[in-house]
Amino acid sequence: MNVDALTGGFDRRDWQEQTATDNPVRFAMIGVGWWTTEQAMPAVDAGDLCETTVLVSSDREKAADVAADSETVEHAITYEEFHDGAASDAYDAVYIVTPNALHLPYVETAAELDKAILCEKPMEATIERAERMVEVCDEHDATLMIAYRMHTEPAVRRAKDLIDEGYIGEPLFVHGNMTEPILELVPDPDQWRLDGELSGGCAVMDIGIYPLNTSRFLLDADPVAVRGTVASVQEEFADVPDEHGAFQLDFPGHVYAVCTASQNAHLDSHISVLGTEGKVRVEPAFYPWDDRALQLSHEGTTVEIDFEQIDQMEEEFEYFAHCLLTDTEPYADGEHGLVDINTIKSVYEASETESTVRLD
C-alpha cells in the first residue's frame, strides 16, 4: 500500500474557493458560556472570513466583560434586546450555543431579522421544535446550518474520500463510540445536560449524535431503521433517560452502524468503517483537542496517517462564512439536522418499546 498515494493531493479545505475578504461575515454569539469564550471566539479570531461583533447573554455585565477583552466586539446586549432587534446592523449571522430547548426562539428572531444562522447540534430538544426551525428559515429564506464539526475535520474528510474512492470496497459495517465522564469535565450536578427538559436527552442526544451523524457523512446515506437500549443508573442522571446508550442503525443496501455513548465513562472516541476489501478508522475521532490518526487496512497491510491537531471550530466557522460569501448552500442544513433528531428520538422509542423503529 503506497502511503504517499493515499495522502498526496489531499486538500485540507477542498471546499474552499475564497481565501480572503474585505467584508468578513460578522457574528453575534448567542450565549456567552465557556464554549463561546474558549472555543468559538478564538476560532473566529483565528480565521480570515469572519469576526465576532456582538455578544448576547442573560447577563449584560458578563457579556460586557468578555467584550472588553475583544478587539472586534462592538456590542454586548441581553437576550431581550436581541429579540427586540438591538444592534442588528452590527452582525450578519448568529451562532447559537444555548441549551438545546432554547434554540428555537433565537432562530425565529434571527430569521425574521434576515440573518444567517449557525446553530449548535442537536438542533433542538424535540422533533416538533426542530421542524419549526426549518419552517421559519424557509419562510424568511434564511440560511441555516447545524454545527457538525466532523464535516470539516481533515482526517474524517480524508476517510470519506478513501471510502468514496473504493479503497475498502463496499462498506458493510460502521462502529462508532463517544464517551466521557461529564461530571468530571463539568462538575455541576445542576448543569443543563442533566435536565431532560432543557437537553431533550443525555448521552445519545449530546454525544451519541457524533457517531450517528459521522456515520451518515462517511456513508453518504441516511438510516432507515433503528434499534436501541438506553439506561440511567446513577442518581445524578435520574432526570434523563440515557446516562448510557447503545444503538444500531440500518442503512440502505444492508449496511449497519453500531454506536455507543455514555456521559459517565472513560473518555474515548473513535469511528471505523469496514468494507469488503478493507477498513478505515479514525481515533481519536470527536473531541476537538486531539491529534488524529487515520488507520487504513487493505490487502493484508495496515498503515497509519497522522493528522496534526487543527482548530475544528475555526474550520467550521470558516466553512460557514465561506458558504455565505460564495452563496453556497451548507452541507448540514436544517433538513440534514432533522434526520438526526428523528433518529435519536427513535432510539429512545426503540429502547422503551424493545422494538425496531422504522424511519421515514
From Swiss-Prot:
One of its GO terms (molecular function) is nucleotide binding. Keywords: NAD, NADP, Oxidoreductase. It catalyses: D-xylofuranose + NADP(+) = D-xylono-1,4-lactone + NADPH + H(+). It holds the Pfam family GFO_IDH_MocA_C3. Induction: Expression is induced during growth on D-xylose. Its EC number is 1.1.1.424. Optimum pH is 8.3. InterPro entries: Gfo/Idh/MocA-like_OxRdtase_N, Gfo/Idh/MocA_domain, GFO_IDH_MocA-like_dom, NAD(P)-bd_dom_sf, XacA-like. Signal peptide: none annotated. SUPFAM superfamilies: Glyceraldehyde-3-phosphate dehydrogenase-like, C-terminal domain, NAD(P)-binding Rossmann-fold domains. NADP-dependent D-xylose dehydrogenase involved in the degradation of D-xylose, a major component of hemicelluloses such as xylan. In addition to D-xylose, oxidizes D-ribose at similar kinetic constants, whereas D-glucose is oxidized with about 70-fold lower catalytic efficiency. Homotretramer. PANTHER family: OXIDOREDUCTASES (PTHR22604), TRANS-1,2-DIHYDROBENZENE-1,2-DIOL DEHYDROGENASE (PTHR22604:SF105). Belongs to the Gfo/Idh/MocA family. This is D-xylose 1-dehydrogenase [NADP(+)]. The gene is gfo6.
